[in-house]
């Protein structure tokens, strides 16, 4: 597997951090992940935080897992940055100020790919497939779990995005 040269911003999930196995599995020279305390920050604060980070880092690609997948979709659409989402939380219910991902967030021409391990014990990935399949490429694998059994699978999707959409 070759090394990835694109600048990647990884958005971790709820109760996770930059110590995430998903972040460390990404084989990229320029990868960034900033810890966010989602539980204690309201939606607008997190949105402004990610907008500021994107302006500073200027990533070529967003990669998000779980709640980070939710934010990757939001930021991808707002900033027109390609994204890869892994077992995304499309309707976060841990706070009342989060609105579910809907057609407005998905119906655009920005390259996005979903990597789904269907054995997720926290989120129903079959419902995620139904919601996303009309809008983006999906790579779904049987088994796995919410934290991802094979986070290294993200690398070939990142390579594909880099070769196809990132000059």
Predicted regions and their residues:
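Catalytic histidine-centered segment of alpha/beta-hydrolase-like enzymes
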Residues: 43-44, 144-156
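Short beta-strand/loop motif that positions the catalytic acidic residue
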Residues: 107-109, 113-120
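Gly/Ala-rich beta-loop-alpha elbow adjacent to hydrolase catalytic centers
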Residues: 63-72
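Active-site nucleophile loop of the alpha/beta-hydrolase fold
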Residues: 13-14, 34-39, 81-93, 117
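Active-site catalytic motif of lipid deacylating hydrolases and related acyltransferases
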Residues: 2-57
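Catalytic histidine neighborhood in serine/cysteine hydrolases
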Residues: 133-149
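Conserved alpha/beta-hydrolase fold motif
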Residues: 61-62, 83
